[in-house]
């Protein structure tokens, strides 16, 4: 199979997130593994054998969760091309979390005649949907709340959601420490992925009569300043699948752990960066499912109206952080079937 892989933004631009998973009302939920609709696409793949497709993979920024998703997308595109007897050429683009660059990438991808676009994360998806304007299938990956991000009820647009069950993560927090008095909510107010989870966290805490303190930042420097304001004011911190905060996750986790504060987050990439715990989806499964959706759309000529909510159910704990905080996490084994232990990844 022929494959085109460019680990640059693009030559023209090189210079210039049931148990843990949420449920979105406008999406559809199914198992985390397997093809989006391979059984329906089987007859289409037979008739499409020998066809060639070009797919643009547009990653919002570099961090471990998005990197894992991209790698899984590429692996599944390779696998589907071999299985279906087709050629899939794909090219990577990276917007460096910059809307201007992402818009430029969108313009280039459309003008270059790609057959489909797979944007990873909210800002990338929004920019690609605008650029495609309904003319090219856009199959997004890892959007926590597609409705809030303005990615529903649009022609030729679908994808996967890693929607959080914020209440469950709050339950985890209080299962470990029932005496928590104040919770810090650390997020970027420019990140669509954070809007619904933060609102849900506030509602949960208000119902329990627990105080909360908000801290926000839209750049790495702002995030580090924001977290420093929490260290003497809160007992635990929650961050959703926020790509901006993830960009500084290692420094945030270190600051909070040094202050004796447990850090709960919306993705396992935070935990491998030093946060204490999360509960969410498997991002390799999410990437594979997204790739299947894109290939099935190309083979069938039809883009599903509903997005797909990935199943969660996996608690991930950083054992080094647990030891540093002197926390036992035995309570988690009563909450889910699968508790994964990790350590902090080397930078």
Give each language-model segment a name.
Residues 87-111, 216-230:
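Structural motif
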Residues 48-75, 80, 91-100, 190, ...:
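Extracytoplasmic "Venus flytrap"
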Residues 55, 73, 162-205, 306-323:
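An alpha-beta-alpha
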Residues 127, 131-166, 265-277:
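Flexible loop/hinge segments that line or gate small-molecule binding clefts
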Residues 56-58, 109-122, 139, 183-185, ...:
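Periplasmic-binding protein-like
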Residues 19-39:
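Bacterial lipoprotein signal-peptidase II cleavage site
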Residues 296-347:
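Hinge/cleft segment of the Venus flytrap/periplasmic-binding protein
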Residues 49, 146-152, 158-182, 281-302:
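Hydrophobic alpha-helical segments within soluble ligand-binding/sensing domains
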